[in-house]
Regions:
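Structured mid-to-C-terminal alpha-helical surface segments
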Residues: 1-167
């Protein structure tokens, strides 16, 4: 049977939680041992690269108020209590844990990817260029570079500033 790897399964869950900030995803992450992030970082990077959002929006997301989603779409799904304060604490801890585990090499790779010229030798997960979601993201970056280079460069600069990496 073909199954998804542990790294992709849990790395994907973390990527989804940071991108969507939905209570279901963060509930799952609350009970994951995120101190072992290094065990799932490869899968996280793959899902981060294939996301439909800029990398910065996952590494440094604007907090979304999910009170209504918690009440209407999650409440009653678990016997384990999960209040909005748990949700906010989990989101904060997850963001901190992910960013604390990004090495300088990881950061340099993410900048090169967001520039549209990934240095795969710096990618902890190796060359992911053949994955359809990664190809799609790189095509979109290329389109942005051609159609609105200023917006593209501003996005790269924002990521560089957050990661504290200079040209």
């Amino acid at each position: 049977a073909r199954t998804v790897s542990y790294s992709q399964l849990y790395g994907g869950k973390i990527a989804a939680a940071l991108s969507r900030q939905h209570p279901r995803d963060l509930f799952d992450c609350k009970y994951m041992d995120t101190t072992l992030f290094c065990d799932v970082k490869d899968g996280f990077i793959l899902c981060l690269l294939g996301s439909d959002k800029p990398i910065i929006e996952s590494l440094h997301p604007n907090a979304i108020d999910q009170t209504e989603a918690l009440e209407n779409q999650f409440e009653g799904m678990s016997d384990i209590p999960f209040h909005y304060s748990d949700y906010e604490e989990t989101r904060k801890n997850l963001i901190e844990q992910v960013n604390a585990n990004m090495t300088n090499t990881d950061k340099e790779f993410l900048i090169s990817f967001e520039n549209g010229e990934p240095d795969w030798s710096k990618c902890c997960a190796g060359d992911l260029s053949n994955y359809p979601s990664v190809k799609w993201k790189l095509q979109n970056i290329d389109k942005l570079v051609k159609s609105n280079p200023k917006k593209h460069q501003e996005g790269v600069q924002k990521l560089q500033n957050f990661l504290k990496i200079q040209d």
